[in-house]
Design a protein with these regions (language model features):
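Short aromatic/hydrophobic "clamp" motif used to bind/position activated sugar donors
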Residues: 91
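Short loop->beta transition adjacent to catalytic acidic/histidine clusters or analogous donor-positioning motifs
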Residues: 6-9, 30-41, 49, 61-65
Length: 331
């Protein structure tokens, strides 16, 4: 079928240390049942052969554009650079170590047009150790955009970018916060707040790869913990606006846990800026002195004390967690 008069769909794909996976990712898009695509690969200064592999595919397929970063800039900057050159009427996001079903674009495009909505949300499947496990959502969260927004704030609808298919104008004036991890948790509420309609397509169309230890969604770093910390701080006032008292407490609980984890990880393997560490410490001081600090359990009470008064406890925790992760990966 000719592409004339068929909407262009842009797909933004950050690529970092994905040499063993990026080929499968690209080919899953090349072989879509809908072909009018703009495939944007942003290679984020990978030290492996990811960039060369992207270039090899681009030479053979004029739908592919490759952007190269000279150094690692982070996934938010990478996605923003992709968004800057989007030409399509619709936008999807895929991570370079994941892949998608061959009908993903066609099914999402059909749904968004027939249902006349701003965004289609679909299911993912988790791929780990060769096994694929579908993850489904409760359709009651999608009665209307207000219900979906509330469910998103509460983490009942995953905040991933990669299981959503947007009208391009949803991103017209929005960009991701750079220099932080878990940016999805911060940007999705902002995007959803500006939408008027939503549809849930109850099919697993995206395959999330848990086997890549270099995954851009990895949670095992001080930077990742700081990103989680910031995302929960960001969502507290959004929950307050909706009168979600219990979820405000949940956000505080998660922010404390993320902060004490981030401080411990950073003491064991320094990577955060001083102002980022101070940001977490100041928050923890305020919570420690608060009369209504949420219950965080004995373990995190010890880590909170360590972060504020006995850094050796936090550092030991960081080393222990990194050690456990190394053991887990070796099994």
């Amino acid at each position: 079928m000719e592409n004339q008069n068929r909407p262009l769909v842009s797909i933004v794909i950050p690529v970092y240390k994905a040499e063993n996976y990026i080929g499968k990712c690209i080919e899953s898009l090349q072989h879509q049942t809908y072909s009018n695509l703009q495939i944007i690969l942003i290679e984020d200064g990978s030290p492996d052969s990811s960039g060369r592999i992207c270039d090899d595919y681009a030479v053979k397929d004029d739908r592919i554009t490759v952007i190269h970063h000279k150094q690692n800039m982070g996934v938010s900057k990478t996605r923003n650079d992709g968004l800057a050159i989007v030409k399509g009427d619709y936008i999807a996001f895929v991570d370079g170590d994941d892949y998608v079903a061959s009908t993903m674009i066609e099914e999402c495009l059909t749904s968004i047009q027939e249902k006349q909505v701003d965004v289609v949300v679909f299911d993912i499947s988790v791929v780990e150790n060769g096994k694929t496990s579908p993850r489904h959502m409760d359709e009651n969260y999608f009665v209307d955009i207000k219900s979906a927004y509330t469910a998103l704030i509460e983490d009942k609808i995953p905040n991933y970018l990669c299981n959503k298919f947007f009208k391009a104008n949803a991103w017209k004036e929005i960009r991701l916060k750079e220099n932080t991890d878990f940016e999805d948790l911060m940007i999705m509420p902002l995007v959803f707040k500006n939408l008027s309609s939503i549809y849930y397509l109850q099919k697993s169309l995206y395959f999330y790869n848990c086997d890549n230890e270099n995954s851009i969604t990895s949670n095992w770093s001080a930077k990742s913990k700081y990103g989680l910390f910031c995302s929960y701080l960001y969502r507290q006032p959004l929950a307050e606006e909706l009168g979600m008292t219990d979820f405000v407490q949940y956000c505080r609980h998660r922010a404390i846990r993320s902060a004490v984890g981030g401080i411990g990880f950073n003491l064991a393997k320094p990577e955060l800026q001083e102002k980022q560490v101070e940001h977490m410490l100041e928050y923890l001081k305020q919570e420690e002195q608060s009369s209504d600090m949420p219950a965080i359990g004995a373990k995190y009470q010890v880590l909170l004390y360590g972060a504020l008064h006995a850094p050796f406890i936090s550092k030991l925790y960081g080393h222990m967690m990194f050690g456990l992760e190394r053991i887990k990966k070796s099994l």
